[in-house]
Amino acid sequence: MTLGRVFGVPLRADASMLLLTVVVTVLYAALARRQLDLGHLGGYLVGLGFVVSLLGSVLLHELGHALTARRYGIGVRGITLELLGGYTEMDRDAPSPKVDLLVSLAGPAVSAVLGAGAVAATMALPAGTLAHQLAFQLAVSNVVVAVFNSLPGLPLDGGRALRAAVWAVTRDRHRGTEVAGWIGRAVAVATVALVVLLTLRRALAPLALPLMLLVAVTLWRGAGQSIRMARIGHRLPLVDLARLARPLLPVPTGTPLAEAQRRRAEGATPDAALAVVDSTGRPVALVDPARVAAVPAERRPWLAVDAVARDLGRVPALPVDADGERVLETVRTHPGAQYVVTAGEDVVGVLHIADLAQLLEPKRKTNT
């Protein structure tokens, strides 16, 4: 759900944010009723007010990342508020360890400043008042966010800072990502241990238990994804489109699908990509394997290849000399099953995403 723009940055809210709103409102309402002697309605209104303030703090935290990234020329696709707080999407990675470090620490720095301001307000406001209670809880939440996010494990901000440090020392960004990913898994395990300890001591509210466990699971999965991407990164130098791309087998427009498949099966390259060509022999479309698979075998002799082909202009293109980083970035920004490989204005082959996946993750099962 799109909420608008803040400083030109698109702001969205995930549906899971509603769960966060309900859980925090209920937890804080119970606390407010005890501390301030409020009725049920008053407690829930105060709880909702705290949620709004908390989400405002999260937004400022993410704006710290976004505006710092833009300061160094990194485009920002948007900020999303969700169950576990929020995240900022950027259109590319940081160009250097220094920029990576500054962008990663900008969010916790904002939270630390907000926490310090809330601490000062707590000390200045009369105890036992609504304003004092809200200031105290905002101080606690922002300090916790600043400290927890600074832990040195991905996907936390501190993990990105650690990645930048390892990157600076080793000159290998992917090594930094892998190191920070493994430490992120350790942080996830430590979070579970903390949840168990607090539960045994009955120091954790019942509604907070599943939320903290969800945080731990999210950390574990995020760390695992970071480790996976680091391993992929180590294999990117192996990407050579001249060797990886499948050759083209031209078939004239109007050719029955079954006939085109027969020609390919009997040819020298049975894994070739079927390219529909016009009367001049120019490729105009690419047969889509997914569409072919959906056609029953008995219909294929009567169906022209044009019916299961995509116009070449609608298929993402890659120059044959593109390196692994560029190929991966294109795959991220233009997801698809096939990519046209070009040399100048000529189409020289087709990259199948399954072939790229097999090269980058040879132990991972893929569908061809």
Model-predicted segments: where are they?
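Small-residue-rich helix-interface/hinge motifs
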Residues: M1-V23, G43-L101, F136-V145, L151-A165
